């Protein structure tokens, strides 16, 4: 008689979360790599992340992805954190170990860089980059962006003090990479950037693009970390000003591939899954 063990259980936690494509992506990764997992969405009350995390772990959960607005909470509640998590104060990937510890990683920036450099074919080395936002999404991508050695990264946020704090947390890394890293007011962040990355939820909330049109020039890569309809406003704005728009679908798949590798020890074929997912939209 043959017995089959239950699959390891994972989920994505957020608020909102119903739009997430992560369950399909991870199911496809598992199929292509021969892994047995179950992966679901979990809508978490805004004041209930710690309880949801504890309940999921107690029920035998193996790990979870964390999306807005809980990435800072995920970093704070973890037992162990990677260097990227410690710098950012934000985590998007949690692993629950048999000894009861929770390990935090942040794969957002790795996914963003892979999508820009590999999938979009845009080099970041020596470029001027504007990062719009200083919340968990922005914090999670700054170190991997610095690792690409751009000429300059400007962080612009509505609350300038938050941008300053994010810059300060990465000042040593910027110096070691010889990158100019600065925080400027969101209304006056500079002009003519090579790459503009929207790490705010302005598109998701239906709000206006929070930076002036002059941040763009002809051919600027304008990247919204959201995807699908949530990114449409930003992408329309970019296209209208001669920039090259790109949504965050590739980042989603690439960061998921990094998370899958953390959990399963296998790197799935992200490019294939991205192509398949793009065809569905």
From Swiss-Prot:
<feature type="binding site">
    <location>
        <begin position="20"/>
        <end position="22"/>
    </location>
    <ligand>
        <name>shikimate</name>
    </ligand>
</feature>
<keyword id="KW-0028">Amino-acid biosynthesis</keyword>
<feature type="binding site">
    <location>
        <position position="108"/>
    </location>
    <ligand>
        <name>shikimate</name>
    </ligand>
</feature>
<dbReference type="GO" id="GO:0005829">
    <property type="term" value="C:cytosol"/>
</dbReference>
<feature type="binding site">
    <location>
        <begin position="133"/>
        <end position="137"/>
    </location>
    <ligand>
        <name>NADP(+)</name>
    </ligand>
</feature>
<dbReference type="GO" id="GO:0009073">
    <property type="term" value="P:aromatic amino acid family biosynthetic process"/>
</dbReference>
<dbReference type="GO" id="GO:0050661">
    <property type="term" value="F:NADP binding"/>
</dbReference>
<dbReference type="InterPro" id="IPR036291">
    <property type="entry name" value="NAD(P)-bd_dom_sf"/>
</dbReference>
<keyword id="KW-0560">Oxidoreductase</keyword>
<feature type="binding site">
    <location>
        <position position="67"/>
    </location>
    <ligand>
        <name>shikimate</name>
    </ligand>
</feature>
<dbReference type="GO" id="GO:0019632">
    <property type="term" value="P:shikimate metabolic process"/>
</dbReference>
<dbReference type="InterPro" id="IPR006151">
    <property type="entry name" value="Shikm_DH/Glu-tRNA_Rdtase"/>
</dbReference>
<dbReference type="Pfam" id="PF01488">
    <property type="entry name" value="Shikimate_DH"/>
</dbReference>
<feature type="active site" description="Proton acceptor">
    <location>
        <position position="71"/>
    </location>
</feature>
<comment type="similarity">
    <text>Belongs to the shikimate dehydrogenase family.</text>
</comment>
<dbReference type="InterPro" id="IPR022893">
    <property type="entry name" value="Shikimate_DH_fam"/>
</dbReference>
<dbReference type="Pfam" id="PF08501">
    <property type="entry name" value="Shikimate_dh_N"/>
</dbReference>
<dbReference type="GO" id="GO:0008652">
    <property type="term" value="P:amino acid biosynthetic process"/>
</dbReference>
<dbReference type="GO" id="GO:0009423">
    <property type="term" value="P:chorismate biosynthetic process"/>
</dbReference>
<comment type="pathway">
    <text>Metabolic intermediate biosynthesis; chorismate biosynthesis; chorismate from D-erythrose 4-phosphate and phosphoenolpyruvate: step 4/7.</text>
</comment>
<keyword id="KW-0521">NADP</keyword>
<dbReference type="Pfam" id="PF18317">
    <property type="entry name" value="SDH_C"/>
</dbReference>
<dbReference type="InterPro" id="IPR013708">
    <property type="entry name" value="Shikimate_DH-bd_N"/>
</dbReference>
<comment type="subunit">
    <text>Homodimer.</text>
</comment>
<keyword id="KW-0057">Aromatic amino acid biosynthesis</keyword>
<feature type="binding site">
    <location>
        <position position="248"/>
    </location>
    <ligand>
        <name>NADP(+)</name>
    </ligand>
</feature>
<feature type="binding site">
    <location>
        <position position="225"/>
    </location>
    <ligand>
        <name>NADP(+)</name>
    </ligand>
</feature>
<feature type="binding site">
    <location>
        <begin position="157"/>
        <end position="162"/>
    </location>
    <ligand>
        <name>NADP(+)</name>
    </ligand>
</feature>
<dbReference type="InterPro" id="IPR046346">
    <property type="entry name" value="Aminoacid_DH-like_N_sf"/>
</dbReference>
<comment type="function">
    <text>Involved in the biosynthesis of the chorismate, which leads to the biosynthesis of aromatic amino acids. Catalyzes the reversible NADPH linked reduction of 3-dehydroshikimate (DHSA) to yield shikimate (SA).</text>
</comment>
<feature type="binding site">
    <location>
        <position position="92"/>
    </location>
    <ligand>
        <name>shikimate</name>
    </ligand>
</feature>
<feature type="binding site">
    <location>
        <position position="227"/>
    </location>
    <ligand>
        <name>shikimate</name>
    </ligand>
</feature>
<feature type="binding site">
    <location>
        <position position="83"/>
    </location>
    <ligand>
        <name>NADP(+)</name>
    </ligand>
</feature>
<dbReference type="GO" id="GO:0004764">
    <property type="term" value="F:shikimate 3-dehydrogenase (NADP+) activity"/>
</dbReference>
<dbReference type="InterPro" id="IPR041121">
    <property type="entry name" value="SDH_C"/>
</dbReference>
<protein>
    <recommendedName>
        <fullName>Shikimate dehydrogenase (NADP(+))</fullName>
        <ecNumber>1.1.1.25</ecNumber>
    </recommendedName>
</protein>
<dbReference type="InterPro" id="IPR011342">
    <property type="entry name" value="Shikimate_DH"/>
</dbReference>
């Amino acid at each position: 008689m043959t017995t089959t063990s239950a699959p390891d259980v994972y989920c994505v936690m957020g608020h909102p979360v119903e739009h997430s494509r992560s369950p399909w992506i991870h199911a496809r990764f598992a199929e292509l790599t021969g892994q047995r997992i179950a992966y679901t969405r979990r809508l978490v009350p805004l004041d209930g992340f710690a309880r949801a995390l504890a309940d999921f772990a107690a029920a035998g959960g193996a790990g979870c992805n964390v999306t807005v607005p809980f990435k800072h909470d995920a970093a704070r509640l973890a037992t162990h954190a990677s260097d990227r998590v410690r710098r950012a104060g934000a985590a998007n990937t949690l692993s629950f170990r048999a000894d009861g510890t929770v390990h935090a990683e942040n794969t957002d920036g790795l996914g963003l860089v892979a999508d820009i450099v590999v999938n979009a074919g845009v080099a970041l080395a020596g470029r001027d980059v504007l990062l719009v936002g200083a919340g968990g999404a922005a914090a999670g991508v700054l170190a991997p962006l610095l690792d690409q050695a751009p000429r300059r990264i400007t962080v612009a946020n509505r609350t300038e003090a938050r941008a300053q704090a994010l810059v300060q947390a990465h000042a040593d890394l910027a110096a070691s990479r010889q990158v100019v890293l600065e925080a400027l007011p969101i209304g006056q962040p500079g002009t003519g950037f090579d790459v503009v990355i929207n790490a705010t939820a302005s598109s998701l909330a239906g709000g206006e693009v929070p930076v002036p049109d002059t941040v763009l020039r002809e051919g600027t890569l304008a990247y919204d970390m959201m995807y699908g309809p949530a990114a449409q406003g930003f992408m329309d704005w970019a296209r209208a000003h001669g920039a090259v728009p790109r949504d965050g679908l590739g980042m989603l798949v690439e960061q998921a591939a990094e998370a899958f590798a953390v959990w399963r020890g296998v790197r799935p074929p992200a490019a294939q899954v991205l192509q398949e997912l793009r065809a569905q939209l």
